Amino acid sequence: IAMDLGTANTIIMQDNQVIIDEPSVVAIRTADDTAIAVGKKASAMIDRGEERIRTIRPLKDGVISDYKACEKMIRGLIDLMPKKHNMFNPAVKMVVAIPSGSTDAEIRTVKDSCLHAGARDLYLIYEPMAAALGIGMDIEGPEGCMVVDIGGGTTEIAVMALGSLVVNQSIKVGGDAFNRDIIQHMDKAHNMRISAPTAERIKMKVGSALPELAEAPEDMMVVGPNR
């Protein structure tokens, strides 16, 4: 299987098909430290204020910030795979995309999380290279190919040629920062408090980056308590 372990979302592919596309969130029962939900179900528990349940986003700025929670999340997401994809232990071979600016310690953390989650053979690939290969770029040629990959926690900018990174930069700004800006704007401009999921919906509906817009985005009604 191939896994894009993102700050905001995690995608799992098998046989050139997207099998899992879920938020990178895990809900853990505080009494026994057991994961009770991952992905969308765990995301729906955010901001509920239940003391017996902790919702954790194990990745921050593109890297793992909570090793144990990340391991539980990976296991849970693999368990969500349909039975026809999951019946022969899908985690025998795993390819995981990592930020191009990852340190040795961060790479070790990714390896440990995936291996403890069930991977037997693990291969890591830098996110810009995975993105370039995914859209059919020829990164083996002598001409440089440039990729700008905006994720939830980081933006990856890289030029590739002859099968390797020529120059790259990983910036800790991405979709999560856009969400925080939306929350701050609603607070200052409209005296309204909104949650992170609401900010995400606003961004996706009226703020998505599109090459061409035949019509302006429709207005969106937002409801929330006063500050």
List the predicted regions and their residue ranges.
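Nucleotide/phosphate-binding catalytic cleft detector across ATP-hydrolyzing
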Residues: 1-150, 158-227
